[in-house]
Amino acid sequence: MENKINSQSLFQEALQYIPGGVNSPVRAFKSVGQEFPRFIKSAKGAYLYDVDWNKYIDYIGSWGPMILGHGDDDVLEAIQCQLKNGLSYGAPCKQEIELAKKIVELMPNIEQVRFVNSGTEATMSAIRLARAYTGRNKIIKFEGCYHGHADEFLVAAGSGALSLGQPNSPGVPEDVVKDTLVASFNDIESIQALFEKYKNEIACIIVEPIAGNMNMIFPQDDFLAKLRAVCDENNSLLIFDEVMTGFRVALGGAQSIYDVKPDLTTLGKVIGGGMPVGAFGGRKEIMQEVSPAGPVYQAGTLSGNPIAMAAGIKTLEKVSQDDFFVKLEAKAKQLVDGLNEAARVYDFNFHAKYLGGMFGLFFCNEKVAVNTFTDLGKTNLKMFNKYFAYMLDNGVYLAPSAYEAGFISIAHSDEDIEKTICLTKKFFQDNQS
């Protein structure tokens, strides 16, 4: 793509008024070695159009929410109908109940739910609730799992799995994260050791059931069931962060696939249909501790916004159709099978995985186990960056980081998928060692 001048110009202007020129760091494309991102003008179906009128097949989908594709006509109609009645009330509305009922109906382990405005709000609220319910302060998270930008989550592991958390962002006091313990994903022994060391101090474990913030790493060897057992043995709560996987890998989220019951679940992305929505929910006895039913404070000016609720209701109605996830996963399978076959033909160190409408791309041989954050760091990150640039220049918009999962929508056509596979074949052919 030769024409990028408007994106480049807008980025230079943005740098004057917005830190780093973007409102979320990954959007800057710095992690993939690009000088500037593409500024988007419009989106429809499976496509993005930038300010230079370049067209892209989009495999980010606004980082997951656009499971129906961009600008779904039914969702837009639901939003437009609500717009006539006002933007926001700061008061209860019927749509809140409708979306809550739908979530409780579809998510196997949510009996009550509270709406917030983002995934970060959902996870920080769930942690506060878990601490209050158990009367304990320490939490366990996993290296490489991202739960938003609340202070207690901005922690990197120390020299070993038993290290107390150390902040990995300036501005986060060590005292804030001293109660955040970090373990290795898929390593149950590190969890057991933490409970032995801090018995009766750990309020909860929070985990992405499928780790989508370190590409796409699946739980191994009944890892989630073992977490459930450890929590039960120690009277701690288990929180599934399904902001990414909820209504994305299956109608009932990852918890329905692995048949493991979390005490609390956090949601976002798909439940807003592209509007800013987050939620946390779980067992009624726990959720009844949330104000005003109980003493655990949580509030939000725009929580339960009627426009966002309307978008979410219509989105969940459509993904609830009997054959929706069958069709969606068939598209993901077509893409991943094609990419893996291309790697086999050209003997290229690459493999892809998928589940539901989510996929991961790994620049290493399929025989190489990628089960932890450390494993992912050993893949060929430079080759991913090269692949990203090639695909972007040829009209395919992938996540601008080797640590991010990709998303397919029901709007992607066979032609979109085949074009992606053909371009990948050409890249593998041109970059054979």
UniProtKB/Swiss-Prot annotation:
Keywords (A to Z) from UniProt: Cytoplasm, Isomerase, Porphyrin biosynthesis, Pyridoxal phosphate
Pathway: Porphyrin-containing compound metabolism; protoporphyrin-IX biosynthesis; 5-aminolevulinate from L-glutamyl-tRNA(Glu): step 2/2
GO molecular function (one): glutamate-1-semialdehyde 2,1-aminomutase activity
Subcellular location: Cytoplasm
Co-factor(s): pyridoxal 5'-phosphate
Subunit note: Homodimer.
Protein name: Glutamate-1-semialdehyde 2,1-aminomutase
Keyword Isomerase in annotation: yes
